[in-house]
Design a protein with these regions (language model features):
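Acidic, polar-rich low-complexity tracts and alpha-helical solenoid repeat scaffolds
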Residues: 1-248
Length: 248
Protein backbone atom coordinates (compact mmCIF):
# COMPACT_ATOMS: atom_id res chain seq x y z
CA UNK A 1 0.00 0.00 0.00
CA UNK A 2 2.89 2.34 0.83
CA UNK A 3 4.37 1.79 -2.65
CA UNK A 4 1.05 2.60 -4.34
CA UNK A 5 0.72 5.72 -2.20
CA UNK A 6 4.21 6.91 -3.09
CA UNK A 7 3.71 6.12 -6.77
CA UNK A 8 0.36 7.92 -6.84
CA UNK A 9 2.04 10.96 -5.29
CA UNK A 10 4.85 10.78 -7.86
CA UNK A 11 2.37 10.65 -10.75
CA UNK A 12 0.40 13.53 -9.25
CA UNK A 13 3.51 15.68 -8.82
CA UNK A 14 4.47 14.96 -12.43
CA UNK A 15 1.05 16.10 -13.64
CA UNK A 16 -0.13 12.64 -14.70
CA UNK A 17 -3.46 13.18 -12.98
CA UNK A 18 -5.39 10.49 -14.82
CA UNK A 19 -3.10 7.66 -13.68
CA UNK A 20 -2.73 9.20 -10.24
CA UNK A 21 -6.52 9.33 -9.96
CA UNK A 22 -6.82 5.61 -10.68
CA UNK A 23 -4.32 4.80 -7.96
CA UNK A 24 -5.92 7.17 -5.43
CA UNK A 25 -9.25 5.51 -6.13
CA UNK A 26 -7.73 2.15 -5.16
CA UNK A 27 -5.96 3.29 -2.01
CA UNK A 28 -8.23 6.04 -0.62
CA UNK A 29 -10.53 3.67 1.36
CA UNK A 30 -7.51 2.13 3.11
CA UNK A 31 -6.29 5.52 4.34
CA UNK A 32 -9.50 6.61 6.06
CA UNK A 33 -8.64 7.54 9.66
CA UNK A 34 -4.89 7.32 9.05
CA UNK A 35 -2.41 10.23 9.17
CA UNK A 36 -2.06 10.31 5.38
CA UNK A 37 -5.83 10.11 4.86
CA UNK A 38 -6.33 13.87 4.68
CA UNK A 39 -3.59 14.26 2.08
CA UNK A 40 -4.84 11.31 -0.01
CA UNK A 41 -8.43 12.52 0.05
CA UNK A 42 -7.47 16.05 -1.04
CA UNK A 43 -5.28 14.90 -3.92
CA UNK A 44 -7.90 12.34 -4.92
CA UNK A 45 -10.51 15.11 -5.18
CA UNK A 46 -8.15 17.45 -6.98
CA UNK A 47 -7.10 14.78 -9.48
CA UNK A 48 -10.74 14.65 -10.61
CA UNK A 49 -10.67 18.42 -11.02
CA UNK A 50 -7.45 18.30 -13.02
CA UNK A 51 -8.80 15.68 -15.45
CA UNK A 52 -11.99 17.69 -15.96
CA UNK A 53 -14.44 15.40 -14.18
CA UNK A 54 -16.03 18.33 -12.38
CA UNK A 55 -19.15 16.58 -11.15
CA UNK A 56 -17.13 14.05 -9.20
CA UNK A 57 -14.56 16.66 -8.18
CA UNK A 58 -17.26 18.80 -6.58
CA UNK A 59 -18.63 15.79 -4.72
CA UNK A 60 -15.18 14.67 -3.52
CA UNK A 61 -14.24 18.14 -2.27
CA UNK A 62 -17.50 18.20 -0.30
CA UNK A 63 -16.59 14.82 1.23
CA UNK A 64 -13.15 16.15 2.09
CA UNK A 65 -14.60 19.18 3.88
CA UNK A 66 -17.02 17.01 5.86
CA UNK A 67 -14.19 14.69 6.89
CA UNK A 68 -11.57 17.39 7.57
CA UNK A 69 -13.36 20.70 8.30
CA UNK A 70 -10.33 22.07 10.20
CA UNK A 71 -7.79 21.11 7.54
CA UNK A 72 -5.20 23.61 6.36
CA UNK A 73 -6.56 22.75 2.92
CA UNK A 74 -10.17 23.55 3.84
CA UNK A 75 -10.27 26.95 2.12
CA UNK A 76 -8.63 25.60 -1.02
CA UNK A 77 -10.97 22.60 -1.06
CA UNK A 78 -14.03 24.83 -0.63
CA UNK A 79 -12.83 27.06 -3.45
CA UNK A 80 -12.03 24.19 -5.81
CA UNK A 81 -15.35 22.54 -4.99
CA UNK A 82 -17.16 25.75 -5.91
CA UNK A 83 -14.99 26.14 -9.00
CA UNK A 84 -15.93 22.60 -10.06
CA UNK A 85 -19.58 23.64 -10.24
CA UNK A 86 -18.57 26.87 -11.97
CA UNK A 87 -16.89 24.78 -14.67
CA UNK A 88 -20.16 22.87 -15.18
CA UNK A 89 -22.18 26.04 -15.81
CA UNK A 90 -23.48 25.93 -19.42
CA UNK A 91 -23.98 28.78 -21.86
CA UNK A 92 -26.73 31.21 -20.93
CA UNK A 93 -29.35 29.79 -23.31
CA UNK A 94 -29.40 26.40 -21.55
CA UNK A 95 -30.84 25.32 -18.20
CA UNK A 96 -29.05 27.19 -15.41
CA UNK A 97 -29.42 24.68 -12.56
CA UNK A 98 -25.65 24.14 -12.42
CA UNK A 99 -25.12 27.90 -12.52
CA UNK A 100 -27.41 28.33 -9.51
CA UNK A 101 -25.51 25.61 -7.64
CA UNK A 102 -22.17 27.18 -8.51
CA UNK A 103 -23.34 30.60 -7.30
CA UNK A 104 -24.51 29.08 -4.02
CA UNK A 105 -21.17 27.30 -3.51
CA UNK A 106 -19.16 30.40 -4.43
CA UNK A 107 -21.15 32.57 -2.03
CA UNK A 108 -20.70 30.03 0.76
CA UNK A 109 -16.96 30.06 0.12
CA UNK A 110 -16.77 33.88 0.02
CA UNK A 111 -18.74 34.13 3.28
CA UNK A 112 -16.64 31.48 5.02
CA UNK A 113 -13.23 32.67 3.79
CA UNK A 114 -13.48 36.41 3.02
CA UNK A 115 -9.71 36.90 3.41
CA UNK A 116 -8.67 33.86 1.38
CA UNK A 117 -6.18 34.17 -1.46
CA UNK A 118 -8.91 32.70 -3.69
CA UNK A 119 -11.62 35.23 -2.80
CA UNK A 120 -10.84 37.67 -5.63
CA UNK A 121 -11.15 34.89 -8.21
CA UNK A 122 -14.30 33.56 -6.52
CA UNK A 123 -15.91 37.01 -6.69
CA UNK A 124 -14.99 37.31 -10.37
CA UNK A 125 -16.54 33.92 -11.12
CA UNK A 126 -19.69 34.82 -9.19
CA UNK A 127 -20.04 38.06 -11.17
CA UNK A 128 -19.60 36.16 -14.43
CA UNK A 129 -22.28 33.62 -13.49
CA UNK A 130 -24.65 36.33 -12.32
CA UNK A 131 -24.23 38.11 -15.65
CA UNK A 132 -24.99 34.84 -17.42
CA UNK A 133 -28.23 34.47 -15.45
CA UNK A 134 -29.08 38.09 -16.20
CA UNK A 135 -28.53 37.48 -19.90
CA UNK A 136 -30.83 34.46 -19.90
CA UNK A 137 -33.60 36.34 -18.07
CA UNK A 138 -33.19 39.36 -20.33
CA UNK A 139 -33.20 37.36 -23.57
CA UNK A 140 -36.40 35.58 -22.50
CA UNK A 141 -38.07 38.92 -21.77
CA UNK A 142 -36.82 40.37 -25.06
CA UNK A 143 -38.23 37.38 -26.93
CA UNK A 144 -41.67 38.16 -25.50
CA UNK A 145 -41.36 41.71 -26.84
CA UNK A 146 -40.38 40.44 -30.28
CA UNK A 147 -43.31 38.03 -30.36
CA UNK A 148 -45.51 40.92 -29.25
CA UNK A 149 -45.06 42.45 -32.69
CA UNK A 150 -47.16 39.60 -34.09
CA UNK A 151 -49.32 38.53 -31.13
CA UNK A 152 -49.94 41.87 -29.51
CA UNK A 153 -51.84 41.36 -26.29
CA UNK A 154 -50.47 38.34 -24.43
CA UNK A 155 -46.82 38.60 -25.42
CA UNK A 156 -46.52 42.34 -24.80
CA UNK A 157 -48.14 41.94 -21.38
CA UNK A 158 -45.77 39.04 -20.65
CA UNK A 159 -42.82 41.04 -21.92
CA UNK A 160 -43.65 44.04 -19.75
CA UNK A 161 -44.05 41.82 -16.68
CA UNK A 162 -40.81 39.95 -17.42
CA UNK A 163 -38.88 43.19 -17.91
CA UNK A 164 -40.28 44.65 -14.68
CA UNK A 165 -39.16 41.51 -12.86
CA UNK A 166 -35.76 41.69 -14.53
CA UNK A 167 -35.15 45.31 -13.50
CA UNK A 168 -36.23 44.53 -9.93
CA UNK A 169 -34.19 41.32 -9.70
CA UNK A 170 -31.03 42.74 -11.32
CA UNK A 171 -30.94 46.49 -10.56
CA UNK A 172 -27.24 46.77 -11.41
CA UNK A 173 -27.37 44.72 -14.60
CA UNK A 174 -25.44 45.70 -17.71
CA UNK A 175 -28.69 45.00 -19.57
CA UNK A 176 -30.78 47.42 -17.51
CA UNK A 177 -30.71 50.28 -20.03
CA UNK A 178 -31.91 48.08 -22.87
CA UNK A 179 -34.46 46.45 -20.56
CA UNK A 180 -36.05 49.86 -19.91
CA UNK A 181 -36.08 50.58 -23.63
CA UNK A 182 -37.60 47.20 -24.45
CA UNK A 183 -40.30 47.84 -21.85
CA UNK A 184 -41.12 51.16 -23.54
CA UNK A 185 -41.20 49.38 -26.88
CA UNK A 186 -43.59 46.70 -25.60
CA UNK A 187 -45.76 49.27 -23.80
CA UNK A 188 -45.97 51.36 -26.98
CA UNK A 189 -46.97 48.42 -29.15
CA UNK A 190 -49.56 47.32 -26.60
CA UNK A 191 -51.01 50.83 -26.25
CA UNK A 192 -51.27 51.59 -29.96
CA UNK A 193 -53.05 48.30 -30.60
CA UNK A 194 -55.39 48.49 -27.60
CA UNK A 195 -59.14 48.90 -27.67
CA UNK A 196 -60.43 52.45 -27.31
CA UNK A 197 -61.52 51.74 -23.73
CA UNK A 198 -57.99 50.79 -22.63
CA UNK A 199 -55.97 52.93 -25.01
CA UNK A 200 -55.58 56.14 -22.96
CA UNK A 201 -54.39 54.31 -19.85
CA UNK A 202 -51.89 52.27 -21.84
CA UNK A 203 -50.66 55.26 -23.83
CA UNK A 204 -49.98 57.04 -20.53
CA UNK A 205 -48.15 53.96 -19.26
CA UNK A 206 -46.02 53.97 -22.41
CA UNK A 207 -45.11 57.63 -21.83
CA UNK A 208 -44.19 56.75 -18.25
CA UNK A 209 -41.94 53.95 -19.53
CA UNK A 210 -40.24 56.45 -21.84
CA UNK A 211 -39.76 58.92 -18.98
CA UNK A 212 -38.23 56.21 -16.79
CA UNK A 213 -35.73 55.36 -19.53
CA UNK A 214 -34.73 58.98 -20.09
CA UNK A 215 -34.57 59.76 -16.37
CA UNK A 216 -32.03 57.00 -15.72
CA UNK A 217 -30.25 57.17 -19.09
CA UNK A 218 -30.57 60.70 -20.55
CA UNK A 219 -27.83 59.88 -23.08
CA UNK A 220 -29.23 56.45 -23.90
CA UNK A 221 -27.99 54.73 -27.03
CA UNK A 222 -31.64 53.97 -27.82
CA UNK A 223 -32.62 57.66 -27.92
CA UNK A 224 -33.36 57.78 -31.65
CA UNK A 225 -35.66 54.74 -31.60
CA UNK A 226 -37.26 55.86 -28.34
CA UNK A 227 -38.03 59.33 -29.70
CA UNK A 228 -39.63 57.83 -32.81
CA UNK A 229 -41.84 55.63 -30.63
CA UNK A 230 -42.72 58.61 -28.45
CA UNK A 231 -43.84 60.54 -31.54
CA UNK A 232 -46.15 57.64 -32.40
CA UNK A 233 -47.51 57.66 -28.86
CA UNK A 234 -48.10 61.42 -28.90
CA UNK A 235 -49.89 61.08 -32.23
CA UNK A 236 -52.14 58.39 -30.78
CA UNK A 237 -52.83 60.52 -27.71
CA UNK A 238 -53.89 63.40 -29.97
CA UNK A 239 -56.18 61.08 -31.93
CA UNK A 240 -57.66 59.77 -28.70
CA UNK A 241 -58.36 63.30 -27.47
CA UNK A 242 -60.03 64.22 -30.77
CA UNK A 243 -62.24 61.12 -30.70
CA UNK A 244 -63.08 61.74 -27.06
CA UNK A 245 -64.12 65.31 -27.86
CA UNK A 246 -66.26 64.15 -30.77
CA UNK A 247 -68.02 61.69 -28.52
CA UNK A 248 -69.10 64.43 -26.11
Amino acid sequence: MSRKYEYAQKLYDEGDFKRANRLYEQIAPQFVGKPQGERVMFFFANSYFEIGDYNVAGYQFERFLKSYPRSDKAAEAAFLGAKSYYMLSPKYSLDQTDTDKALTKLQLFINAYPESEYTVEANAMARELTTKKEQKAFEIAKQFVKLGEYFVLDYNLSGIAALDNFVNDYPGSVYREEALFQKFRAASNLAINSTFRKRKERLDEAVEAYNNLMKDYPETEFAKDAEKLLEDIQEELNKYTELENLAK
